[in-house]
């Protein structure tokens, strides 16, 4: 698909998001929390319901579709095999499955930014009881992390580094590849939370050289909540504990055909050992259809569209005296997430009252773009902020 064709399809996508297409009074900048429903996903849910209503045995069809989705996710991530992909319930479960599969001794340590997402950070912190030391890097003024960020905190007892590819509160794009290439040869695993990046840019887990990554599918991938993905690099799996942290029938390779329990289970040697037998099949269908839509457009077109829209956002806000935190270098910033340095809590209520939906965090108001956003949304946001200024609401 050419660039012009891809951009045209993105622009047409707004018509498939009724919340923004049919409501002139709503301007939505909150994809990083959860995007509004689109007709691709809604139609998939309706299709699932129809199968359940009128098919006497739909589950095998759904299970087969889930396997097709696994293949599609592997293709998107450029995983060497779909066996490296496990479906989970969310990011938290995926991260914890890896964290609790690692070998470590009391006194070993893991290093992460203190601004890491709580779903990631507290997974490591829960292992303190078993003797793991958690080292937190102060990150108040850090808006980009690479290997040099972690190096002063890493020593011979470091077993892992935890990092988000895109930080939820700032939109910064960390240099995951640099971190992995520096520390993985030192037998330090790098676990990456990619929830704020998937569906919004291309990802190559082999090029990034991650030990493992986990993400939820309800943000950039537009699915209902309840489905996540865990990728584990094939060379890393043999280094993990033999028994997964959560075990059900889905983890067992030698499962008896009559479903009898035996005392000598053989766990899958692949990432499938981390799966439940029953997963959110309805959400795997949604993921299949929406990810297919994105891949058909092409992520190079998606990235270009979002970055151009983001540049317009930054330019318009700068005219109003509003700065965006972090680097202006696109190599250090996500495609879609911009945090305006507006700290006064009055703005959150004011924006919502004006129909502008965003999220306020410790560094300011996060304005996160989706494919349904357009230049008119940027203009409406700017006009709303002008109105707030006229109402004498200070930025800070």
UniProtKB/Swiss-Prot annotation:
Family per similarity comment: Belongs to the class-V pyridoxal-phosphate-dependent aminotransferase family.
Protein name per the record: Uncharacterized aminotransferase C777.03c
Subcellular localization(s) per the UniProt record: Cytoplasm; Nucleus
Disulfide bond entries: none
SUPFAM superfamilies in UniProt: PLP-dependent transferases
Keyword Cytoplasm set for record: yes
Keyword field: Aminotransferase, Cytoplasm, Nucleus, Pyridoxal phosphate, Transferase
EC id: 2.6.-.-
Gene Ontology molecular-function annotations: cysteine desulfurase activity; transaminase activity
Organism: Schizosaccharomyces pombe (strain 972 / ATCC 24843)
Keyword RNA-binding among record annotations: no
Modified sites of kind N6-(pyridoxal phosphate)lysine: 219
Cofactor(s) demanded: pyridoxal 5'-phosphate
Enzyme class, broadest EC rank: transferase
One cellular component term from this protein's GO annotations in UniProt: cytosol
Primary location class: cytoplasm
